[in-house]
Amino acid sequence: MRSSAWALSLACLLALVLTGCTLNTTAAPTAEAGAAISGIVHGGQNPIIGAHVYLFAANAGVFTPNTNGYGNASVSLLTAGTGRTQDTTPSDPTYLDYYVTTDSNGNFSITGDYSCTAGQQVYLYALGGNPGLGTGTNPAAGLMAALGNCPGGTSAFATGTPFVFMNEVSTVAAAYAFAGFATDAVHVSSSGTPAAKLGIANAFVNAQVLQTSGVANAAIPPLTAGSGGGDAPQAEVNTLGNILAACVNSNGTGSACTTLFANAESGGTTGNPPADTATAAINIAHNPVAAVGTLYGLSMANAQFSPTLMGQPNDFTMSIYYDNSLFNDFGALAIDANDDVWFATDYVFKLNGQGYDLTGYNGYSGFNNPYNIAIDVNGNAWALNSSAVGKFSNSGTLLSPTNGYNGLGLSTPVSIAMDASSNAWIGNYGGGNVVKVSSTGTLSGTFTGSGLSAPGPVAIDSSGDAWIADESSGAIVKLSNAGVAQSGSTGYTAAVLSTPTGIAIDHSGNVWVSNSGGTNGSVVEISSTGGLVSSSTGYTNSALGNPGAIAIDGAGNAWVADPNTISEISPTGTFLSGSTGFTVSNGYNSIGIDGSGDVVLNYDVYNFQYTNPFYYMQVMVGAATPVVTPVSLAAKNNTLGTTP
């Protein structure tokens, strides 16, 4: 009964996301009566007796530019009532919050006499209790379970009383899913803007994809005809669950807890130590390369969950792989304001953040063989093929002629970016110039200033200027919105730049360029006026071999795709991904970051048993800081590289 009740709730949640989420800026939040919730709290395989179970909602604070409400305390939903107790210990993170207590079998029950706001994201947090000790309790035992949308009214949980299984697996799933919005277990928040609400709602769905009823999922089954299945990181979730269990199943004072807390601090091995295992899980998600060997060793002592990783991983990033048999290839990707992911892959396809196909069996048709794509400020998708650009509405209607907008010598265009007026800027490699296409399809240009001869990647800054990496000279060319060169006669250069392969712009207006030329790859940072922010040799380490596409997250960190690794670089040039990068599968040629803080990648991999490759969308769950999407809208509103 436990599994079926929770599975029903999960099915309802996933049904909501199959059609894609849509931003709603007009609906006013309404308070709803809460639904009754029951469940059980386990440490490993043992019930935890006397645990305090709190019901929290993520805080959607008042929007303030550049602060955005992130870091605010979660909202406690329980109030005084029968069976509820108030925490009166001032030093507790839950001071003055109300809780219910688990019984001798670890069971708890929350009646429906509370309220929450439609669209609020709700989670359970259990603290303390006896995990099977002879006497005493473990105050360091913290567990979580993400419920999702406010469990009342017309929400997914309104049809019945959900039974929630809380353990280390549900904790890991919750910690990674909403890592981009969490400071610790009792500080989960966002700005409350429509984009932020959408991002955190999608994040909570990821928690259900990772686990069901406290059991790590191995596969993501397709729920509709044509939707992709996929593989969940079951072994990694279980391994991380075992790391937490070593501390949870103790009195909180032994080496399992002290080792965990010393190596899962707010900065990894530095910063503030966690007060409990739930916050430790969030800190591991925030610092996935910190003390990996030490933490992995904790999982070996008394494994409670299986299967597990066969050996020590390179890092503790967590990825879901969504496959889709409809794809013939994976071209570039772009993310729209609904956090849906668009792919140009012979046809135009749109998937939601959980990998489900939103386009139908043949994708959006009418424009043949596209391989690159960008989203304009109105949500329309612009796709490139070898001689034209096609325009689709957000619902997939072809808005351009069947053959697209063409002319002005468009030949083998390789890149596209959108400005604030929904003009498309195209790197026309075969023509050796840049072509600008208006929102109605009028072509202008061709632009060849600053010695531009082999245009590669293109990006638009918040002033409307276009930045183009020249793949022949290695120079970075800046054009005004009218197409006038702003970067001298030869463009901006750096000693290391020879084969620029990716370009992105942060909130300060600095331009990040990935460079695959030379013995080792590098990333060069240039100011808005063309001066070097990085050294002339760029940011380098052993992880950068052949860097390509690049994206900026909401903290201003640059994420760089390499064939076998992903690198994360801070605004000051520190490699947050360590000396070897985050290990991923091979074949990446595009990268994006969504409003949930997920890093989205495309890749193909050949299997020796098959002639044809498999194509996947990889989602690194909660790895980045949530960011405003699409990039064109962020550029228009001067919110590039900021949180929603």
Each model region followed by its residue ranges:
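C-terminal motif of bacterial Sec signal peptides marking the signal peptidase cleavage site
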Residues: V17-G20
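Extended surface/linker regions that mediate inter-domain or inter-protein docking
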Residues: G199-F327
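Flexible "stalk/tail and boundary" regions
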Residues: A291-P644
